[in-house]
Amino acid sequence: MSEFSIAIPTHDRGENGPKWLKELFESLKVQTFQDFDIVISDQSKNDLILDACKEYSDDFEFTYVRYEGDVPCENINVALKECTGKIIKVMFSDDILVAMDALEILHKEYENGCKWAFSGFCGTKDLSLIHI
């Protein structure tokens, strides 16, 4: 069992979906704390997200689930139900971890008795720019 499960509910975002998901994967690859698995609950109707996951299958331990329903919040629940890590971090396909030690910081707090934490974002992303 991993320390962390990274739960990522996804849906159809056209060509941007896999692009943004790969950016998230790249931010996870450089984390100083690497004891995590990734759970993808994919609500899209095509294989673009699945193909992006396959590209990173040598880098990460994945659980991939195709969610056929049409309720976005249930897609999050599907991802959460598949998590096996001691700590669950929900991320969305257009999120990234900016700090390379983000998971390490969360893990240290967990080890110090923290039972619940949340994180925020520092900007928004459009098709060509990151706004901080």
What do the PLM-derived regions correspond to, one by one?
Residues R13-V30:
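Short, well-formed alpha-helical segments that are part of the catalytic scaffolds
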Residues Y67-C83:
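Glycine-rich, basic loop-to-helix element that forms the pyrophosphate-binding segment
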